[in-house]
């Protein structure tokens, strides 16, 4: 199966971090025990120096099969994907992970929650409108904004139950929900803004024309009527991709980044 080949071919450079330190921080975030002393303590930990667990060493065939089957199900089910070719399906619906989060069975969880809602609200063929419907459901639960610790991504199951973090986590939750519903989306980012010297991420929707439309649940609705923007001055922007991008891989740690 070509979908399995795509995932396996690009699997070697994907990994998660592990350690009791991350387990403890996740528990603290889940309980929102965010007192100054705890934060000060964990700021001294270099989370990105913890051991890496590579997907190729731990992933199971059952995990891949479930992910592929559910991804194919929504790709074929929804009419807006008639114009979504296999290559774009592989990048914007199929991937089982986002970045360096622990592996989890997120797709079934989000599928079972969000697809019944989408199916009850919309029966059309417009992917932009479908995206709006899921955005409407996502914005019902606000993200608890927290930026004090620099840690690897949290897994999809954790974020489903505990919405805490900053723009990165907001994008992750949105991506999980949209892909579980067969809506092709990506996360884009810049490393540095000339305006406020910081990192930022946002989501984009792949329209049926191949155009990518910026959106943010609760703040910026996806639309074709105008070029949407969050009004931030951006430096060079990149798009996260699961497949290794030869032109930018060496620049950004050999992971799947693409200039946009």
Language-model region placement:
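Hydrophobic/aromatic-rich core segments of domains that either
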Residues: 116, 121-137, 147-157, 163, ...
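Secondary-structure boundary elements
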Residues: 1-162, 198
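Surface beta-strand/loop "capping" patches
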Residues: 254-260
